[in-house]
Structures are given as structure tokens and as C-alpha cells.
């Protein structure tokens, strides 16, 4: 199947700055006609939630870019990446020509130089049969890279068979996988004689990234455990199987192999649970236990459900990276329309969700003349360890996107967007009353949050410009909508000033239960006895660019949001500005 064919079925994820665990978010800009013009009604979506025991309390704020920020002259997707001993990145793409103008292949090995500031150049080193085998019928399956690691100068590359077709079954099952290896930095590859994993069991494999040449492994785990390469695996498919060809993956598994023998299947051991805090390992695949299980579904219904996927499982092919300054492991997963990011103190957990970034249903917007965005997410989310800041609080996310574009450049290339994470520190609010101090401007590490932002302009509702409008139209008939901020330290507050954005025939206002919430100890708490002036009408008569003031007794928190049931037949709200005061 051609690359275009693959792009039709393989849709991307993410692209604003989301919320869930610690409540992070984003926003964009509204157009003059209804944003739901081509939408199609389906039954109302159920509210989605994760129990508090599964939510992280490690990061006070987290934000990831609304769209691609750094692009490159390359072609392809997936872009599994490692940082090698020679200080280069080695990245393997699927379905493209890589960093070359030549023919397109199902798998391409590239060496990449540069950084997000100076830009990237690359060189193609090997392609197709030079890299790995197709274990099934080549008429029905081709090769896809799922993970790569460098250890002691050797590259190990995990490759799976992924369904080609016919028709809609493409990309919906992955029955076999193996590992190729290179001792000359990617120019020559050696292959196993048979697949290492079959039957759709542990067939999406991605390696734990311990930095340059896996240099942090021994530091993080100790000399003995640091002798191994660690690999995560999914069963069935690399993401949910949109045609139910196989079961959707709900479980993330962990294995390890001696760093000199990753290609030898009989040397692998699988995480089989804990004895106290000590992991147990078994050579028997049947003994394995999941390190993370998440059965949530995103977008259980969709207004344009006949055209695009919905009811999406959240465990997918991404990456796991160790952030040494924070002593934390990050797993970057995704769905068609969201990023799903987790953190843990050890490779085996406990894994907890710290960020859901919701980009809304299609269409998305690329960067280009006349485009209202950009706002776009992507699939196969990874964090190259080479570009993690020295203090561990900023890094760059790679993901890809092709289908569902309303204009502008898509992201079918090696590209990056910035993510910023600030660890939580318990503090006491110390701000003094000041009628002019708008915490939406002056708060520490102020981070906009929302359910979703149609055009990805998260800066609009704390930029002081009351003429710009963002809205939350996202193709979902949602029960709740919100706009707000989180901070890296707590504040006293007693007033919120909300200015609406543009109104549409099918939405733009809150329909019921509009209220203020503050975040305390990572829980969102309703503020009691709030007075709204003027009275909020809960209809289209709310008015475009109209200001409402919420006054309440002094409270404190390291986050604030207005929340309620969205209005109109398309279930969305709008915003121009949100101000927060302690007066």
C-alpha cells in the first residue's frame, strides 16, 4: 500500500496543552461562521474520568505545544529515535523517503544532526530489506519500526509486521515482531532467522531510552540491573484496532535482555510482578504481568463518527524515556485525538497519568497562509532524550499527523514541539490583596487549561486582548466544559472575570451549572456561594464578548477554572479572556 493509503487510515493525535491529572490546557481562535457547520449529531458522550488513585501528583504544571514548532526536510512517520555514543540521533521512519529525495520505503534508517534551535539535517543509511524482514505475506503485511536503542555503540531496532489491507483493515493488526541490530551505526543490519514474537503477543516493542548510549541505565538502576536493555510491549496492535480485527491494547508490558544479546529471544525475561518493591522476572512469556493497565476510552461518540474513528483505547505505541534530573520515567501514549502521558518512579511503575492533551476531533489546522491555527496533534509520540534540558523541566515531543487537515502543512516528517513540566512543591500562598494583580498574567508558570481548544490559541484568554475569541468545538457532545489556569505555586483569590468569545447558532455559551473551581491537593473543588454579575442567562443571549464577574469568599489553590455544561446543539463554549484576582 502506498504512503497515501496508509495516511488515510493512520490518523494522528494531539496538539494543544491538555488537562486531566494535574489539569493542564490550551486555546485558539474562532472563525466567523459556525465551527460545527459540517458536524453530524450522535448521542451525547458519557463523561470520562480516571480515579484519583491513578492520577499523578508529581507535576504542578505541564504544557505541550498546540502544533508542530520545529520541522525538517524529511518524509515519513513513526520516527523511533535513539541518541548514540557518537552524539548523533539515529531515527527510523515508516512509509516515506526519510531524509532523502529518493524512493519511498516502508522502513528507512536515518542519521540526524542538529537540534531544535539550529534545525535538522539527515542522511539515509539503509532501507527496506537491508534493515529487516517481513515475516508474513508481503501482499498483506509490511515492516514498521516500533523502537530503537543504542547501548555500547550497538543499535537495536524493533520491527513489526503491520497489516496492509485490503481496505479498512489496514494498520489494524500486528502479528509478528523481531529485532535487527547494527554494529556500524546503522549502515549494515543483521536480522534474526525467525520472528522473536508471534501470534500478536508482545509484537509492538519499544525500548526504554536511558540517554546517550544508554548511559543513565546503571546510574538509575544500579550496576546489576543496568546490564540490561529494557523493552515495553503491547499485544494485538500498535494502537486500538479500528476494525476490531484484534483486541484493543489496554496493557503495557515490560521485558529485559542482556545488553549484548537483545537479538536472542531465549535471553529475554518478562516482568512478572513484585516481591515487595523488588521486580520479579521470568523467561516465560505467560508469566508476565502488566506494568500499566488503562481501560479508558476517549471520544466514545463523535459528531462526524461515520468518517473518523471514535471510542478509542489509550495505550498505544509511543516511547518511554528516563528524565535523569527528575529521577522520573515518562511514557508518551496517544489516541486519535489526544496525547496520554504517564510518569513513574521506576520502569515497572507505578505508572500514573499526568496529562491528557485533547486536540479535538478533525479537522485540524496546519501552519500556512489563511489558516486559523495551527492546531494539530500526532501519533507515535516520543521524546528524544538528547533534547531534554539539563534541569529536566523542558523537552521536545515528536509525533506525526496527516489526515483530517483543513489547510496548512501537516506533520508527516521528523518534527518537534516543546513540552514543559514543573514538579510539584508544597507551598503556602503568600500573595497580598491587589486590585490590579491579575494572576492570569503574573502567576508562577501560569498554564492555560481547557477541555479542548478548537484553534489551539491558548494564549488568547490571558493576553489582554478582548477582541480575540477561542471556542471548545471538538466534534464531541460533551457534558462538561471548562477554561482556566494552573500555577506552580498556590495563591489566594476571591474574584474571577470571564469575558465570552464569539457566539454561534449552535453553541458558544454555557447551558447550566456554571461555577468556579479551585485546585487543592490535585483535586478540583467547587467554590461555594459564588455571585455572578450580571446574571448569567445560560442561553445564546449570554452575548458575544460580554463580561461576567464571579465574586466569592477568599479561597486558595494552585489552579482555577470556570466549569459547566456547554450549550447549543454542538455543545461548546467560547472565551475571549479570563482574569483572576485577590482583591
Predicted features by range, described:
Residues 1-17:
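N-terminal secretory signal peptides and thylakoid transit peptides that target proteins
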Residues 353-387:
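Conserved blade-ending motifs and adjacent loop-strand segments that build the rim/top face
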Residues 466-528, 544-583:
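Aromatic, loop-rich ligand-recognition surfaces of beta-strand-rich domains
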Residues 54-60, 88-138, 162-173, 185, ...:
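Beta-propeller domains
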